[in-house]
Amino acid sequence: MNLHGVSGHHEPNSEPPIPTGSSSPKLKISPKLNRWSRGRALRSGVKLDRPIPRSDNSPRRQVTEAQPTDEADKKTTAIDVEVTAGKSIYLVSDGTGWTAEHSVNAALGQFEDFSLNRGSSVNTHLFSWVEDEERLIEIIKQAAKEGAMCFYTLANPSMAKSAKQACDQLGVLSVDILGPIIEGIASHLGVSPSGLTRGAPGRVKTLNDAYFKRIEAIEFTIKQDDGTLPENLSKADIVLVGVSRTGKTPLSTYIAQKGYKVANVPFVMGVEPPRTLFQVEPRKVFGLKIQLVVLQAIRRTRVKTLGVDTEAENNYSGIDLVRKELDFASRIYERNPGWAVIDVTNKAIEETAAVILRLYHDGRDTSTTVPRISKRY
């Protein structure tokens, strides 16, 4: 992967100080960016408008959300939002930005000590559906002002070229994520890429079998949530089981978006699971387990958001009750050795889903010794 604009990037000893306090400049950030940054802050556990623990010399991260208006939701015009940050990374895409976001997030996993040990932070800012050069250049200029790095996924060769040139001229360190992949596939297939963006008028949008299969899977999964319609468990591709708050519903939804019909069944202490569960082919059933203290913490957070009384809280998140529920689930798993049991403690949904799909396909494909998940395009 090539890094562009390295020569124009600030040297560490000449990097301008990050303004703090009331003198911090206001940055122009789109409403989409503002909402996305807020979501990132919530997922990472950082409270909005509150400083995180830091050393005296480390920058403070603060995310402040402006009140969106109906007009702002429809347009991508810039608004004034004050953001105090450590290092910034811009993600620019002519589509949803999914590829750029997930690629960079995967890479950032290699630098966890940057925020943990150095007391600093990295803020990623997503700019999606960037399909005109004027807006592209405006974003890169803003990146230059912030001393940000820029990653882009632009299918149009002209736009990708403009992004590289602008980053080089403005001294912005940049990476073209999609370009090398497109070039490699073009060479392998022996054909030229279309160069059309995801939403281009000339692009053929076919509603193929895979599309309808995905819609059908999502609809099925929604209807089968939380043990509903147990008589349909045999129709599921994958069945997830486990005690409350092990992530069955979000995991089911995530896997369903990949075209798999997923059902989930909760284990409630003292209540035997439906008989139809034990009639499902064992390789399709996946048990979820989690560490005791982690599950208790998740449940405590849940009951606080619901505002229940102390007695109800103890009946749901009390340590003795949680331990008994986990033991109850373990006994069911022991009686069904054909089920794969996965520890979801501190795992992202994507990680658990990847494990489940690998095991699911391992059990189906016996034609090769190397596990694979195959798709046709």
UniProtKB/Swiss-Prot annotation:
The keyword Phosphoprotein does not apply. It is an enzyme of class 2 (transferase). Regulated by light/dark exposure. GO terms for molecular function: ATP binding; phosphotransferase activity, phosphate group as acceptor; protein kinase activity; protein serine/threonine kinase activity. ADP binds at G242, V243, S244, R245, T246, G247, K248, T249. The keyword Nucleotide-binding applies. Keywords: Cytoplasm, Kinase, Nucleotide-binding, Serine/threonine-protein kinase, Transferase. It is found in: Cytoplasm. GO terms for cellular component: chloroplast; cytosol. Residues 46-63 have a biased composition (Basic and acidic residues). Its EC number is 2.7.11.32, 2.7.4.27. Transmembrane segments: none annotated. It catalyses: N(tele)-phospho-L-histidyl/L-threonyl-[pyruvate, phosphate dikinase] + ADP = N(tele)-phospho-L-histidyl/O-phospho-L-threonyl-[pyruvate, phosphate dikinase] + AMP + H(+); N(tele)-phospho-L-histidyl/O-phospho-L-threonyl-[pyruvate, phosphate dikinase] + phosphate + H(+) = N(tele)-phospho-L-histidyl/L-threonyl-[pyruvate, phosphate dikinase] + diphosphate. Bifunctional serine/threonine kinase and phosphorylase involved in the dark/light-mediated regulation of PPDK by catalyzing its phosphorylation/dephosphorylation. Has a much lower phosphotransferase activity than PDRP1. Can use ADP as a high specificity substrate and GDP as a lower affinity substrate, but has no activity with UDP. Interacts with PPDK1. Was thought to be devoided of phosphorylase activity, but possess a much slower rate of phosphotransferase than PDRP1. This is Pyruvate, phosphate dikinase regulatory protein 2.
